[in-house]
Amino acid sequence: MIIDGKLIAAKVRGEVAEAVRALKASGVAPGLSVVRVGDDPASAIYVRGKRKDCEEVGIRSDEHHLPATVSQADLLALVARLNADPTVHGILVQLPLPKHLDERAVLDAIDPRKDSDGFHPFNVGALSIGIPGTPRPCTPAGVMRLLDEARVDPKGKRAIVVGRSNIVGKPMAAMLLERHATVTIAHSRTQDLAGEVARADIVVAAIGKAELIRGEWIREGAVVIDVGMNRLDDGRLVGDVEYAAAARRASAITPVPGGVGPMTRAMLLVNTIELARSGAR
């Protein structure tokens, strides 16, 4: 089975649009502020996509575009203003930032109650100890929704997360553990990656290396979620998993593109309306 992230993301957007209508009927107009620094073309494309998603579901979205030379103090001042603005329910700082800026300090400055990305240390800590009702990082949250839609229950299953980034790998492992999977985290120094993958019922690949996970490593009937997005020299986009060979062994697999990517954007909308609900209480 191919797990269609585009189709599931459209379903999520429909749910969000319904929730937005209910919030507006109660006098709350959800608002997301996006901060973009510099003129990185990829960042500009991502921000345009997020704005389009917000328009589709009825969330007010505004972009604060700052020059690449902006100072740390001026960027933090903008974040402080957005924190204090009652019409802003979610704040997202588009990464990466220019090298002269302290990315961690900027993310830490966002009010955790407005943290649409789920990257604030408070929210990361809440996830790790199981505090409900806090925003979850969008990509891992999207992966969990894909598993749910594919009727894959992680409970009791062996899951491997290949990659240990703060954005995907670590929170992904925490969410699978929360759902009672037995979780292994693999990374660049894992000794026998093929053997670890071969033991897993659920494989989440998020290491950022094109087709690192070979198809023959996949256990028969395993579920494969490919978070990777890598452009080859010939222009093709591929994931971290050797797709065609893995698909012959997996019971369910996400394509690249069209798998996890659309879900990341959809879960940003989910986080934003949940923050708006919390702010209205």
Curated annotation (Swiss-Prot):
| Keyword terms of this UniProt record | Amino-acid biosynthesis, Histidine biosynthesis, Hydrolase, Methionine biosynthesis, Multifunctional enzyme, NADP, One-carbon metabolism, Oxidoreductase, Purine biosynthesis
**Record's SUPFAM superfamilies?**
Aminoacid dehydrogenase-like, N-terminal domain, NAD(P)-binding Rossmann-fold domains
Q: Which reaction does it catalyse?
A: (6R)-5,10-methylene-5,6,7,8-tetrahydrofolate + NADP(+) = (6R)-5,10-methenyltetrahydrofolate + NADPH; (6R)-5,10-methenyltetrahydrofolate + H2O = (6R)-10-formyltetrahydrofolate + H(+)
State one molecular function term (GO): methenyltetrahydrofolate cyclohydrolase activity
Q: Tell me the GO BP annotations in alphabetical order.
A: L-histidine biosynthetic process; methionine biosynthetic process; purine nucleotide biosynthetic process; tetrahydrofolate interconversion
Query: What Pfam families does the database record attribute to this sequence?
Result: THF_DHG_CYH, THF_DHG_CYH_C
PROSITE patterns named among the record's database cross-references:
THF_DHG_CYH_1 (PS00766)
Supply the EC number(s): 1.5.1.5, 3.5.4.9
CDD domains, per the entry: NAD_bind_m-THF_DH_Cyclohyd
Q: Which GO terms describe its cellular component?
A: cytosol
Pathway entry: One-carbon metabolism; tetrahydrofolate interconversion
Under InterPro entries, the record lists: Aminoacid_DH-like_N_sf (IPR046346), NAD(P)-bd_dom_sf (IPR036291), THF_DH/CycHdrlase (IPR000672), THF_DH/CycHdrlase_cat_dom (IPR020630), THF_DH/CycHdrlase_CS (IPR020867), THF_DH/CycHdrlase_NAD-bd_dom (IPR020631)
- Residues annotated as binding NADP(+) are G163, R164, S165, S188
Q: Which Gene3D superfamilies match?
A: Leucine Dehydrogenase, chain A, domain 1, NAD(P)-binding Rossmann-like Domain
Annotated function? Catalyzes the oxidation of 5,10-methylenetetrahydrofolate to 5,10-methenyltetrahydrofolate and then the hydrolysis of 5,10-methenyltetrahydrofolate to 10-formyltetrahydrofolate.
Protein family membership: Belongs to the tetrahydrofolate dehydrogenase/cyclohydrolase family.
- What PANTHER family does this protein map onto? C-1-TETRAHYDROFOLATE SYNTHASE, CYTOPLASMIC, C-1-TETRAHYDROFOLATE SYNTHASE, CYTOPLASMIC-RELATED
Tell me how this protein assembles: Homodimer.
Name of this chain's protein: Bifunctional protein FolD
Species this protein is from:
Anaeromyxobacter sp. (strain Fw109-5)
